[in-house]
Amino acid sequence: MDVEAGEDYFFGNDVDMDDIIWMGPQPSVKDLAAQVGVQQSFPFAQLKEIVGKAIAQGRKVHFLPPYRYDNMMLLEELTGIRASIVKKYASLELIKAVVALRSVKEACEIEEIDLACNIGYEMHTAAMRLCKPGVKEQYIAGVLDGIASSYGSMTSFATILTQHGETLHNHDHSHILEVGRMMLTDAGAERLSNYCSDHTRTVPVGGKFQGRQKDVYNIVLACHDKALEIARPGITYMSVHQEVCKVLAQGLKDLGLMKGNIDEAVAAGAHALFLPHGLGHMMGLDVHDMEDLGQIYVGYDDEVRPSSQFGLASLRMGRRLQEGFVITDEPGCYFIPALIDKWRAEK
């Protein structure tokens, strides 16, 4: 896009016969350009010529921070900036413009996310039905992946399904489900349009809670419902997170696992021993929407700044909510042996 000239360009190479043999007939570059409202299309090699000319004229070339290594290498070829440092030269103006554009979802986008959530619902209810003693985690994870695939979709991220939920991103599905354990499933679907869903649910193996499991489950459920109750346009998600943490701390205090003044405990971050992550994040074309652009620009702004406090520092979304935002609500309660041992050693 040449902002100064007010012109859009589409670069790409048309397929040759070898491509057609292996991939079948493909739309032309000109047709692809027309689909997105661009009238001028050129072979990909001309992109380097146009960018090089702009640089030679002293014009600023705007690009987003590259996430994939191949794009880093391409930007090095186009701009002459070494791939190892090219991220430092990403355009802050363009980052903020894209964040502003993608943060507020249109009705058609929300419809796509709803459809992805419907697939996610089917995935999670299947996991609940299969959560029985003697079943291998990998089998259930495979069923979930298959459900997403059956809709022409894919999973929105690598499925997390485990009876060792104390590891937050546990992709080890090698265990056999056992009576008395809880199975955590963190999974979602991604539509062909790339819009995503993301749900986290925990259920008892065999369908019956044991000991304090139901008490802890109900605390997390109350946290989830508290976020739904208070989240609205105009309130910061940082404050929603903090209020949810108070519900968690109060519930754990009632169980004898925390003590003292709840407000003071949450302000000090004591609850992070059990909830060492944030409540939620933006969701859209990526499951952690736009995270590659820099979470400080996506989840925060000049008004709400990220915290360095343990637990709260992992909150990806803290800024003031607006109508059209799509945010996840994912509280949890974890008993992480290494973290508990560290806390005991530092008492």
Predicted regions and their residues:
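Active-site neighborhoods and metal-handling regions in enzymes and metal-associated proteins
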Residues: M1-K347
